[in-house]
């Protein structure tokens, strides 16, 4: 997922992907989506999903001083008044040592704390306001006099705000929350001020209407068109009274989305179940018991062990999932499931009223802009329309329904044959447990027994080897080159085939429930940019971070991953590749910037397909103790199990996408239906087992209420069609033909990964594939092609 949404999960089925398929999107992205950062979360089945930095001075030196980030480096045209305003800010003794305001090569994640946020952000905003005023006075409809100074303003805010927003996601404290909450309205006010600037808007329109328009590159034309459209969507055409109302709505939406995600995090942290009786945890694997004992030790039970306890279960994914999959204790499964399903739905952490207010304000915003509903606003910057999105969801739902019904019948029959008392009354806290038992029986695969073959170091080695084969890049550790926010964070350098650095990325792999948001996401730190390059460099190199929440090392063992966790790492790496391998030098359309939201999941979901490719899987599946490769027969079983319960997993994702669209098209805040009524109604056609009456999954659906996926969750399925078809190009070329794979990989790199937001995604896809996308490969990969043909 692109970080734009802390990922929330309502049940294990949400966390588990459909056999093919942010969060937490930085809430700073409510405005000007092509210029302000977004991050991209995984879909709910996995675990959950900033922008721009500098290149080294040379290919051999580790010094990055020639490209340091300088928050107060003034453009040459800055007036003396603006310069004086900057000087008054910088000269303040309390600010001179503020890490948010210092020149840096890489963000000083290790030295920023809550005390720096208020003074640092306010000083930065004062400086940027002076720059904006100067730009408005001197703006001309030319690239050097409009786009370049605008990019500098946007970039400075993006990088610095992205730094503190990232720390809030991975190193949360009450003090940091409070500081960000205090300055957030001022940051939003500036973003609105920038987005609604008439001089800038008119200058962009003048460029579009000039005789030189046709001579501009496609990337520059896309940039101009996006700026004009986004200005309209941010209210520039409204009269003063309506624009003031619009701005109040945006401020309130920003606050509400932050509060929503904080409530989800706090509610997730709040639940802890202490178990002292080993009978209660029968069936749970040693890896889970070790994790539970480790949690108990951290809570003061110093003598806790995996064998004898005590054990603490939490709602964090590495803890929650094993309970739902393996606990024979049905009462325990029910308790944990209900706790997970009801997160942030009661007491001080209740998100119900927040959801209602968010939906109400989004509808008001849409009406002010002249749209019928918020979904139309959302789709204005996407590939799809409301009608096309609904059409795709219904086509996939029809192809999935009968298979999902049969899945449930198979599950009940299997449970009955095993003598399960619940076989005739199977419900939500039973399906995951019995699905795991059926999968073990049918394919002789136990996911826990696979863990020793998927140690994190081997998985990363194999992933980097695949990237070299497909895209001709080398990835090497660069730990110590950049400050990090936790000792477990790794830092890597990406090099081209000539050995030149072209990008960098951080990787934060492990769950830290006490301070880190759940889920998995990729986000930008800095983007590739010609304008932001420092003296002596032609372009600033992109930097990304990948964040996961997988099982941490237990005892002296490395992190041993489930296959789902392996897929998640591949997924986030796909996002990072599109950010890092861009060839666009226009910073506002480089990498993932300005790509339509329903196309950004293409590279991430494409990369997941390689987890099932034999040579790739065998390169990462090495037993952590013996070095033994995963047995061939086990690989074949894993491949055969790929479409296991495909209809059920597909339907689950379609439910999330459908309720999202319904809430943003037909739901009337304050009307006869509640949000939960809508959820129940949509579930009639998208869930074989009806949801519980007390189902409150919406209260933790961060993708659409605290991220970038409002009226956009369908994007996972939309992009799934694109990604499956893209992977089929490699199948057509021959997956065993290394020469053909390399050639196809280079073509993928030169189109999908390189062109960024500078070209319409459909054009990019056609350039790679030679034709428009087809849903056939997706249905074939999921084993649903026959169902589709008869639907």
Curated annotation (Swiss-Prot):
**Mitochondrion as UniProt keyword:** yes
Coiled-coil annotated residue ranges, if any: 118-138, 239-259
Q: List the induction conditions.
A: Not regulated by pathogen infection, elicitor treatment and flg22, a 22-amino acid sequence of the conserved N-terminal part of flagellin.
The entry summarizes the disruption phenotype as follows: No visible phenotype and no effect on germination; probably due to the presence of the presequence proteases PREP1 and PREP2.
- Catalytic activity reported: Hydrolysis of oligopeptides, with broad specificity. Gly or Ala commonly occur as P1 or P1' residues, but more distant residues are also important, as is shown by the fact that Z-Gly-Pro-Gly-|-Gly-Pro-Ala is cleaved, but not Z-(Gly)(5)
GO terms in the biological process aspect are:
proteolysis
Q: Which GO terms describe its cellular component?
A: chloroplast; chloroplast stroma; mitochondrial matrix; plastid
Q: Which cofactor does it need?
A: Zn(2+)
Alphabetized CDD domains for the sequence? M3A_DCP
The domain of life for this entry's organism is: Eukaryota
Location in the cell reads: Mitochondrion matrix; Plastid, Chloroplast stroma
Enzyme Commission (EC) number: 3.4.24.70
- Which Gene Ontology terms cover its molecular function? metal ion binding; metalloendopeptidase activity
Under SUPFAM superfamilies, the record lists: Metalloproteases ('zincins'), catalytic domain
Q: Locate the active site.
A: 572
InterPro entries for the chain? M3A_DCP (IPR034005), OpdA_N (IPR045666), Pept_M3A_M3B (IPR045090), Pept_M3A_M3B_dom (IPR001567)
Alphabetically list the UniProt keywords: Chloroplast, Coiled coil, Hydrolase, Metal-binding, Metalloprotease, Mitochondrion, Plastid, Protease, Transit peptide, Zinc
Please list the residues that bind Zn(2+): 571, 575, 601
Q: How is its activity regulated?
A: Inhibited by salicylic acid.
This entry's comment on the bound cofactor is: Binds 1 zinc ion.
**Residues annotated as binding substrate:** 703-709
Q: Does the keyword rRNA-binding apply?
A: no
Q: Which family does it belong to?
A: Belongs to the peptidase M3 family.
Q: What protein name applies here?
A: Organellar oligopeptidase A, chloroplastic/mitochondrial
* Lineage of producing organism: Eukaryota, Viridiplantae, Streptophyta, Embryophyta, Tracheophyta
State the encoding gene. Answer: OOP
């Amino acid at each position: 997922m692109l970080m734009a949404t802390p990922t929330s999960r309502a049940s294990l089925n949400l966390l588990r992907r459909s056999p093919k398929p942010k969060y937490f999107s930085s809430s700073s992205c409510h405005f000007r989506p092509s210029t302000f950062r977004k991050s991209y979360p995984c879909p709910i089945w996995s675990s959950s999903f900033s922008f721009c930095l500098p290149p080294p001075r040379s290919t051999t030196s580790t010094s990055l001083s020639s490209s340091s980030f300088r928050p107060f480096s003034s453009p040459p045209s800055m007036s003396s008044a603006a310069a004086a305003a900057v000087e008054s800010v910088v000269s303040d003794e309390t600010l001179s040592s503020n890490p948010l305001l210092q020149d840096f090569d890489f963000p000083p994640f290790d030295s920023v704390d809550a005390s720096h946020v208020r003074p640092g952000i306010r000083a930065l905003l004062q400086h940027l306001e002076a720059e904006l005023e100067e730009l408005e006075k001197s703006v001309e409809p030319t690239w050097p006099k409009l786009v370049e100074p605008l990019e500098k303003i946007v970039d400075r805010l993006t990088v610095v705000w992205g730094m503190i927003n990232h720390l809030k996601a991975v190193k949360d404290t009450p003090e940091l929350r409070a500081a960000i909450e205090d300055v957030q309205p001022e940051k939003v006010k500036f973003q609105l001020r920038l987005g609604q600037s008439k001089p800038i808007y008119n200058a962009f329109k003048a460029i579009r209407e000039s005789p030189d328009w046709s001579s501009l590159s496609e990337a520059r034309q896309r940039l101009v068109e996006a700026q004009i459209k986004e200005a309209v969507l941010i209210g520039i055409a409204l009269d003063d009274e309506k624009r003031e109302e619009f701005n109040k709505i945006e401020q309130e939406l920003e606050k509400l989305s932050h509060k929503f995600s904080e409530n989800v995090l706090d509610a997730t942290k709040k639940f802890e179940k202490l178990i002292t009786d080993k009978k209660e945890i029968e069936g749970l694997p040693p890896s889970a018991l070790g994790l539970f004992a480790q949690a108990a030790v951290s809570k003061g039970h110093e003598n806790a062990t995996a064998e004898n306890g005590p054990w603490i279960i939490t709602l964090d994914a590495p803890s929650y999932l094993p309970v739902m999959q393996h606990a024979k204790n049905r009462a325990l499964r029910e308790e944990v499931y209900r706790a997970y399903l009801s997160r942030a739905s009661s007491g001080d952490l209740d998100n119900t009223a927040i959801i209602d207010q968010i939906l109400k304000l989004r509808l008001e915003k849409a009406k002010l802009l002249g749209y019928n509903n918020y979904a139309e606003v959302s789709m204005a910057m996407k590939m799809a329309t409301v009608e096309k999105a609904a059409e795709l969801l219904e086509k996939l739902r029809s192809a999935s329904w009968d298979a999902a019904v049969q899945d449930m019948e198979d599950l009940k029959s299997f449970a009955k044959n095993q003598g399960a008392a619940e076989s005739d009354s199977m419900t939500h806290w039973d399906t995951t447990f019995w699905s795991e038992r059926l999968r073990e029986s049918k394919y002789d695969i136990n996911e826990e027994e696979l863990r020793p073959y998927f140690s994190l170091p081997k998985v990363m080695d194999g992933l980097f080897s695949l990237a070299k084969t497909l895209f001709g890049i080398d990835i090497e550790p660069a730990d110590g080159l950049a400050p990090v926010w936790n000792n477990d964070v790794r830092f890597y350098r990406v090099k081209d085939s000539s050995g030149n650095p072209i990008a960098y990325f951080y990787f934060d792999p492990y769950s830290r429930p006490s301070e880190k948001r759940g889920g998995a996401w990729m986000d930008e730190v800095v983007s590739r940019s010609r304008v932001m390059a420092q003296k002596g460099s032609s372009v600033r190199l992109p930097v990304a971070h990948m964040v996961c929440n997988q099982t941490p090392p237990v005892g002296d063992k490395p992190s041993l991953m489930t296959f789902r966790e392996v897929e998640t790492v591949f997924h986030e790496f796909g996002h990072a590749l599109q950010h890092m391998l861009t060839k666009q030098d226009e910073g506002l359309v480089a990498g993932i910037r300005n790509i339509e939201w329903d196309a950004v999941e293409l590279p991430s979901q494409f990369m997941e397909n390689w987890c099932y490719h034999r040579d790739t899987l065998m390169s990462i599946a090495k037993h952590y103790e013996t070095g033994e490769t995963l047995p061939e027969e086990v690989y074949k079983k894993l491949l055969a199990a790929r479409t296991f319960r495909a209809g059920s997993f597909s339907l689950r994702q379609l439910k999330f996408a459908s309720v999202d669209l319904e809430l943003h098209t037909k739901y009337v805040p304050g009307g006869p239906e509640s949000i939960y009524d809508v959820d129940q109604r949509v579930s009639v056609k998208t869930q074989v087992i009806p949801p519980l009456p007390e189902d409150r999954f919406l209260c933790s659906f961060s993708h659409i209420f605290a991220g970038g996926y409002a009226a956009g969750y369908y994007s996972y399925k939309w992009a799934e069609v694109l990604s499956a078809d893209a992977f089929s190009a490699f199948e057509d070329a021959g997956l065993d033909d290394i020469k053909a794979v390399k050639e196809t990989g280079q073509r993928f790199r030169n189109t999908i990964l390189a062109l960024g937001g500078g070209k319409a995604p459909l054009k990019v896809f056609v350039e790679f594939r030679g034709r428009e996308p087809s849903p056939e490969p997706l249905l074939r990969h999921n084993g649903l092609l026959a169902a589709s043909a008869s639907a």
